[in-house]
Amino acid sequence: MAGFSHFSQPPYRDLWEPPRPGGERESTQRLGGQRSGADSTACSRAGTPGAESEAGACWLHPHCSFTPRPRRRGCSDSLRGSRSLSDVARRPLERSRKHRPRSRRLEDAWGETGTKPRPAWQPQTQLPPQRPQPCPHYPLAQGDSPPPCPGGAGTPLSGTFRVEKAQGGDQWAVPLGRHLGRWSPSSVPSERSSVPSQKFKRHSACVCAQKRDSSDQVESLASRDSQPLASSKEMRSPHTQVLKSKLEEVVVSSQDQQIVALVLTRLKKAQRIRELQQQAAKAWEELKRSDQKVQMTLERERRLLLRQSQEQWQEKEQRKTLQSPEQRGLRRDSQRKNVPPGESRWKEQPEDQESPRQEKLEKARAQAEHRKQCQVRRLREQEKMLRNLREQHSLQLQRRLVEACRKRHLHAVEGQKKVQDTNLSSLINYQARKVLMDCQAKAEELLRQLSLEQSFQRSQEIHQGLRKERQRELREKAQKEEEQLQQARWRAGESEEQRKMRKRILVELADEKIRQARSHVHKTTRDKVQHLRELNHLREKNHHILKLKAEKEEKCHIEGIKEAIKKKEQRVQHISQGKDPNFQEFQKLPQASRREERAPPNSSLDQMVLEAQLRACQQNRGY
């Protein structure tokens, strides 16, 4: 039964490793606008400006907050369409892989193209919010979290962001106000952690201060990055506004909040179970100590009674030996008085001869009777003492057996509950991670599309500006050259043909320069597009390799979980069928005691040996 106390340990070490320090601050600063935009959107719809978002996340510690792991690009939403809640348990734990953070890769891509994306938190005209479509294949149950849509856990089939049940009057929906870095393994709750809810309340002030600092950083970045790009005309295009509105409408659904609440209840229940186990262990120790004290007192009383009986017997023997000569003299005198005087003379001689023999016979007879009575009395006392001891031992054994059966049943029930709690908590953790990963993947996909479109618009704008500037310079230069030619013609008096030829040559030179500039601009744009295509191809290839590796790790993890569950079920089945060695030992003890009761006691020494053996068996069973 002691094996059930280890069910709360982590099955795998990856889930409790500390988070990696790099790659979180940069992603927070770049994607901080998403938090502020989502907060403003959720507050405007809920009617309370920022109250629900801070109330929903005030208990999270800054080091224990859920930091979602990004989903790698290249995996279409249609592949997730056939998944359900039963597939969540097959998702692997945190992979120990070394690759560059996604924010660093985006920075490299922006640096190679020579442009950076425009911040997504600039104020734009918002489109009317889309009404969320309920999932047709998963009806909601009372007291349960809403099931995921058919396209995946929190991933719509259209590939766009929607407000997940925020407009439907859901009181648990809060805007996404977390860092969009990699998934932190320290954020996964487990049965092993026994932190009470008061510890989370203690760190609410830290979380609120961190939110205010992050919002200040977002506002400073927005004011700094929006100044040099305020003159852009293509940013007002409808497609860019749609992407921004979708990015700002990212919220965490009620499923995440219910998952967190359920995890907290599981933690409290596990702590309560541990306290009950400690109390039961203390009670068992006290019971063993009291049992030992009772046995010691019984043994002391038995020895005292035995000593008293021996002393009484010795006193009686001494009293009889001292009083026997006097009694014989008195009896002889009484006989002499009763005999007539005539007969006493001729009877004195045979009486004197027979008196020693009679005295010897009487003495032997008295001693035999006394020994017989003492032996009978001793046997009766021993039988009575043995009967009392057997009754006491049988009562103690019955009481202990009933208590042991009750505790064994309680331990078995607690073990089954622990197994169910661990399985449910692992499933909840997988669901929470899946939802958060999908949210981050959507945000990154929208950011990537927005950055690509912004860079393309900026390159087109630069190209058009350069072309206009070049044409203006060429026109001015042609005018100056024409003026110089006219002045030279007037001065030198050249003929009309020479002037026409010179003008034609100048026009051809100007056209040639224009063509060269145009070809150079087309070549640079074509090279940039080709470079972006190669970069996307490499990213897709890397994503495919990582996906294969993740599937392999997922299979290994599922096999490990199945094997652990199978071992636990076998253990519970053995205990329930009575194949446990402790239970067999409990069954053998009453049989041995019954055999000892049927067997007649040979002597007091054999009885003491049997009592010592029985006491040793009881002590071994107690420990």
UniProtKB/Swiss-Prot annotation:
Pfam families: DUF4659. Keywords: Coiled coil, Isopeptide bond, Ubl conjugation. Residues 217-230 have a biased composition (Polar residues). The gene is CCDC185. Residues 14-28, 344-376 have a biased composition (Basic and acidic residues). Residues 1-241, 314-376, 574-607 are annotated as: Disordered. Residues 76-87, 184-197 have a biased composition (Low complexity). There is a cross-link at residue 528 (Glycyl lysine isopeptide (Lys-Gly) (interchain with G-Cter in SUMO2)). InterPro entries: DUF4659 (IPR029090). The keyword Coiled coil applies. It comes from Homo sapiens. Residues 266-295, 359-392, 431-501, 534-573 form a coiled coil. This is Coiled-coil domain-containing protein 185. The keyword Zinc does not apply.
